[in-house]
Amino acid sequence: HGKKPSAEFKKVHALVQKSHDECVKKVRIGMTGIEGDKLCRHIIEKAGYGKYFIHPTGHSLGMKIHEGPYISQIEKEKLKENNVFTIEPGIYLPDKFGVRIEDTVVLTKSGAKILTK
């Protein structure tokens, strides 16, 4: 609320951004939702914040705002060409702050294309 971001906030924000960018760069047709989720989650876990990433990495969009295949730790369905889904890793530190970075992507033969700005 008008304060400069703390060093911890900057660190967490950069980590979430790195996690997001890695998933956008590496997600591919034929991966399961589990594999897509791991692209984000392993970066956050490796940095020691895994227990603060408390939601799935993303969800598909269609007739409903949240639908499968999900980009989650339990989604076995494979991603297909032209699937539209979110990539939205986040870290939530209790009584401090939370950071989530979200984009909607379409999965093409060459990878994820960001649709949001």
Language model features: what each stretch is:
Residues 1-117:
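Active-site neighborhoods and metal-handling regions in enzymes and metal-associated proteins
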